[in-house]
Swiss-Prot record:
Gene of this entry: rpsP
Biological process according to GO: translation
Pfam family name, one: Ribosomal_S16
The protein's name: Small ribosomal subunit protein bS16
GO MF, one annotated term: structural constituent of ribosome
Superkingdom field: Bacteria
């Protein structure tokens, strides 16, 4: 199963994270399929860069976001776009 999750990058005591699509059986910092964004919680406010189009693609292909990534997607409106896209596809079918 493909998951959209965080992988840690950055120095010791200065974590930053990449938002990636990867197989759920891979270790946290293992081989990823695609980099979908960046998250730095140490800045004020937290720095987040998202590739919305690619995230929506992976979600439409059945990728499951982790709880942390889901909260980021909801905060920036990507999850709402996905749900709207999903319901519009259902109603047109």
């Amino acid at each position: 199963m493909v998951k959209i999750r965080l992988t840690r990058v950055g120095a010791k005591n200065k974590p930053a994270y990449r938002i990636v699509a990867m197989d759920s059986r891979e270790p946290r910092d293992g081989k990823h399929l695609e980099i979908l964004g960046f998250y730095d919680p140490k800045t004020d406010p937290a720095t987040i860069q998202l590739k919305e189009e690619r995230i929506l693609y992976w979600l439409s292909q059945g990728a499951q976001p982790t709880d942390t990534v889901l909260s980021i997607l909801k905060k920036y409106g990507v999850w709402d776009k996905f749900l709207a896209m999903k319901t519009s596809a259902k109603s047109s079918a």
